[in-house]
Amino acid sequence: MSIYLNKDSRIIVQGMTGGMGSKHTTLMVQAGSNIVGGVNARKAGTSVELGGQDLPVFGSVEDAMKETGADVSVVFVPPAFTKDACIEAIDAGIGLLVVITEGVPVQDTAEVWAYLDGPANVGQTRMIGPNCPGIITPGESLAGITPHTIAGKGPIGLVSKSGTLTYQMMYELKDFGFSTAIGIGGDPIVGTTHIDALAAFEADPDTKAIVMIGEIGGDAEERAAAYIKGNVTKPVVGYVAGFTAPEGKTMGHAGAIVSGSSGTAAAKKEALEAVGVKVCKTPSETASLMREILQNL
């Protein structure tokens, strides 16, 4: 099994005809994803050939869902239009909304988050992102930009704030493989949290152990630690990026900033280790520990 995404997922791409959208749609097709179309109101009724497939372009998410039965949408639209694209997909009742776009205004994401949490979300849409690499269930489907050749299917569940650390961890543990790897994004507000992914991996019978990657800024890792204590029985190994980050300086992601004693890597490490999660110093050490755990299960 897997979480959120599998071989039966039917994917549309909002912004499929743009430069990044067309490039990554091609790569998703090559990964085995069931891409059933795209959305661009100005090009409705046309089609584009990507990855050897002739993909229809629809005028709206609602039309695309009616015609194709799509249940996943991947968003590749400019930051200024991302909020509207998300709300359109939510109104249409899409099951999973994967927002790749970086640079979305925090206020816009907050409004989308509130919309997701409100009565308008009748379809109970789950959003991943924004500013994320998306989600991959190796050997089955990719909704996002994660290189699908890094690792195959296996027993590890991976949840990470960082895209590049997602890729590195998958490479480090390619000998074991992954049930699902999900990059939740590094912005201050995201649709799916560490806790959401931990709960899903705990419920997934094919996930035997979990790698959780965090970074400086906010308190998501501390809240995840509190959740792990009472709810997660599977082994969890952690890595927190940013032990040497200077105070007050944003480090790559909009949410990766230390203010005083708040959001430090040390505080996150302490919280996680207090509930039995071993937090390693490097990605390689994290992979080595996970490998040891799996060999002893």
Task: Please report, for each region that a protein language model flagged, where it lies by residue.
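Catalytic-core regions of core metabolic enzymes
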Residues: 1-297
